[in-house]
A protein has these predicted regions:
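Asp-based, Mg2+/Mn2+-dependent phosphohydrolase catalytic module
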Residues: 1-20, 112, 128-234
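Short active-site oxyanion
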Residues: 118-122, 175-178
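N-terminal helical cap/lid subdomain that shapes the substrate entry/recognition surface
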Residues: 6-109, 130
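Catalytic-core regions built around general acid/base machinery
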Residues: 106-118
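Ser/Thr-centric signal marking residues that sit
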Residues: 29, 125, 178
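Short glycine/serine/threonine/alanine-rich loop segments
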Residues: 54, 88, 119, 173, ...
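Short, flexible loop segments at the rims of nucleotide/cofactor-binding pockets, characterized by
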Residues: 97-102, 126, 155-158
Length: 234
């Protein structure tokens, strides 16, 4: 039985006969995190400084402190919050660098394989619905999902137990028969506490940055490693 495309740790974890539901993160998991990192760490600070007549580069330190204060909360992920907080048109600024939005390798084939295998595929993201709309428009991934759920619709970030409780209320799933793929260790920790049995992370969410710490979670370099051999295309 061919298994060369799968790492031993992923082969050991993902028994596809034991999985009914696949929950997928968006930014850093299906999509290259380079867009988000560039936007929040470079582009927005630049535009923020320009809007306030500050010297180039001087706005970054202030924004980094503001980001840090909101990390892991719904506010951090909210376009509306940052538009109010910074008095800037965040979505217009995102459009300026939207050419950086890109799908990670083998994602589309993986999504097609999941549908062919009869798995229920749900995009479960902390991204604000405005960001989701932009990225789905740029990537065309929407038809591959049975449902798209933003944490903002549930009023709880994925780092919180309330997110999983509320998700299950609208999207029934058996935690013991569910796979979550996410690049965020705090989110994976939260899902583990909730009881989601199958957890996989991403080694390189941002293609322009080094491999990240994946903790004790099985990790993939790309989605070709996660596809069961019998589902692989050419």
């Amino acid at each position: 039985m061919p298994t060369s495309g799968l790492s031993a740790e992923v082969r050991a974890l993902v028994d596809w006969s034991a999985i009914d539901t696949v929950l997928l993160d968006m930014d850093g998991t299906l999509l290259d995190l380079n867009f988000d990192n560039h936007f929040w760490q470079t582009h927005l600070p630049q535009r923020y400084a320009e809007a306030r007549g500050l010297p180039p580069g001087s706005g970054r330190e202030e924004l980094m402190a503001r980001y840090h204060a909101r990390a892991g909360t719904l506010a951090w992920y909210s376009v509306d919050f940052w538009e109010s907080e910074l008095e800037l048109d965040i979505m217009r600024l995102k459009e300026e660098v939207a050419h950086l939005i890109d799908i990670h390798p083998h994602v589309v084939k993986f999504l097609e394989a999941m549908r062919a295998a009869g798995k229920r595929v749900v995009l479960a993201t902390n991204a604000h619905h405005k960001s989701v709309t932009l990225k789905m428009a740029k990537t065309g991934l929407t038809p591959h999902f049975d449902a798209i759920v933003s944490s903002h619709a549930l009023d709880a970030a994925k780092e919180e137990q309330a997110f999983w409780q509320r998700l299950r209320a609208i999207e029934p799933f058996d935690p013991a028969r569910t796979l979550l793929v996410d690049d965020s260790l705090p989110v994976l920790d939260s899902a583990r506490r909730y009881g989601i049995a199958h957890l996989v992370t991403i080694r390189k969410p941002d293609t322009q940055k080094p491999v990240k710490d994946t903790g004790d979670y099985p990790a993939i370099d790309d989605f070709s490693q996660l596809m069961p051999w019998r589902m692989k295309g050419s």
